[in-house]
Amino acid sequence: MAHSSEPEYRLYVTPRFDEATQKDGIALRLETAKVFASFQYDLSVKETEDPSRLHLKVLGLKTPPLSLPATGHARFSREYEKLKGEVEVTVEGIEGKTATVLLKIVPNRIQVVRRPKGSFLQVITTDHPDTAFEA
């Protein structure tokens, strides 16, 4: 169990440009702070999205297809094209605890306008897409 000063989840957000569609967007990865020794699980997440809000509700863990034993964080990754301007992102954990971050999303840049209260969620942004999801 995490100490109260350690986050339960980390949210990585980075700008993305889709060469195929020629559209700007963001890449988002939510992962557990906890490292699992047996498998690198996927997070099962229910998404609710509208133009200015994104709600991510963690439902649980699932083993990825073709999973081989590996150590790692449980993860959920997704790309979004429709989120622009000021966007509120809320993460809801399995126990119902929530944290909300306010992001300003413009092409090639993501700025944290308001960080979540408490230490449940750590938010990490980068303007360098190549390094955004490095372990």
How should each PLM-predicted stretch be described?
Residues 20-24, 48-50, 70-72, 81-83:
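Solvent-exposed loop and beta-edge segments used for protein-protein assembly and interaction
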Residues 83-92:
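A short tyrosine-centered beta-strand micro-motif
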Residues 115-135:
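Compositionally biased low-complexity segments at domain edges in trafficked proteins
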Residues 63-66, 93-102, 108-109:
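Short acidic/polar inter-strand loop motif in beta-rich domains
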Residues 6-36:
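Contiguous beta-strand segments within globular domains
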Residues 59-82:
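An anionic, turn-rich surface loop/hairpin at beta-sheet edges
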Residues 13, 32-65:
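Contiguous segments within soluble domain cores/interaction surfaces
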Residues 25-27, 53, 73-75, 98:
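Intrinsic-disorder/low-complexity, polar/charged segments enriched in Ser/Thr/Lys/Arg/Asp/Glu/Gln
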